[in-house]
Swiss-Prot record:
This is Glycine--tRNA ligase alpha subunit. Gene3D superfamilies: Bira Bifunctional Protein, Domain 2 (3.30.930.10), Class II aaRS and biotin synthetases, domain 2 (1.20.58.180). The keyword Nucleotide-binding applies. It comes from the Bacteria. Its EC number is 6.1.1.14. It comes from Listeria monocytogenes serotype 4b (strain CLIP80459). It holds the Pfam family tRNA-synt_2e. Belongs to the class-II aminoacyl-tRNA synthetase family.
Length: 296
């Protein structure tokens, strides 16, 4: 099964479970969780079921295309369901079966790995899912997003697209993966991986990046003053990516690192609170009569 077919199979399966299928969000981010389709939609009582592929940029993980499984940019297939179904783990195992992986014939383990994203004020109960000794998925029940307690709980399933495809195709090197017939992962992504790694570690203008972080922070704050959550959140994502670029260049000290993360977290918390309040003023329109409760 090539990678393109694998993604389509997951999309079809989760669509059958009631999830809407979205396209990736067009601002740089380090993980699918940071998309507003997860971060903002996990806030408040309104139900939400969605799936999407999210390119995720992690500058410090770039290896110029020389490492078989560490990348500047990888892909995640993200599934979020709120409220979390009681049978969410069974649904997940069903998705593996659709990919030709019979849980009865493989060693599938849920290894406790509670999750935290300090820069966005997020935390939850979590498990890594290991398939025959390889981590392929992160499974999380959100307890807190943007500093707000989550009720109802959102379940998040994050498939590592390249890792899962490597297992299915029995490839040791991600660049040898077949994306579709006649086209490899290398054909599509190798040059970008090499050039982005060069940029992240060698050629980025750190003075400019420092200025950009401050500029993005000010603009996020300014938009928040007008109650504009989504424009403000875009700039928080830009702050996060800019910080990651600075971190990759090694120009951020340990003390400064904590300060930068704190600045991003403060913005994210303000946005989460404002988003909740804005939906509350609208009467949480997606909540049905039997819907969820509000934050206490």
């Amino acid at each position: 099964m090539n990678l393109q077919t694998m993604i389509r199979t997951l999309q079809d399966y989760w669509s059958e479970q009631g999830c809407i299928m979205l396209q990736s969000y067009d601002v740089e981010k380090g993980a699918g969780t940071m998309s507003p389709y997860t971060f903002l939609k996990a806030i408040g009582p309104e139900p939400w079921k969605a799936g999407y592929v999210e390119p995720s940029r992690r500058p410090a993980d770039g290896r110029y295309g020389e490492n078989p499984n560490r990348l500047f940019q990888h892909h995640q297939f993200q599934v979020v369901m709120k409220p979390s179904p009681d049978n969410i783990q069974e649904l997940y195992l069903g998705s593996l079966e659709k990919l030709g992986i019979n849980p009865l014939e493989h060693d599938i383990r849920f290894v406790e790995d509670n999750w935290e994203n300090p820069s966005l004020g997020c935390a939850g109960l979590g498990w890594e899912v290991w398939l025959d000794g390889m981590e392929i998925t992160q499974f999380t029940y959100f307890q807190q997003v943007g500093g707000l307690e989550c009720f109802p709980v959102t379940s998040e399933i994050t498939y590592g697209v390249e890792r899962l495809a490597s297992y299915i195709q029995d490839k040791e090197n991600v660049f040898d993966l077949e994306w579709t017939e006649g086209i490899s992962y290398r054909d599509i992504f190798f040059q970008a991986e090499f050039e982005n790694s060069t940029y992240a570690f060698e050629t980025s203008n750190t003075d400019m990046l420092l200025t950009l972080f401050d500029t993005y922070e000010r603009e996020a704050t300014r938009q928040m003053q007008d109650g504009l959550v989504f424009p403000a959140y875009d700039y928080v994502l830009k702050c996060s990516h800019t910080f990651n670029l600075l971190d990759a260049r090694g120009v951020v000290s340990v003390t400064e690192r904590a300060q930068y993360i704190g600045r991003i977290r403060n913005l994210a918390r303000r946005i989460a609170k404002t988003f909740y309040e804005s939906r509350e003023k609208l009467g949480f329109p997606l909540v049905k009569e039997e819907g969820g409760k509000r934050h206490e």
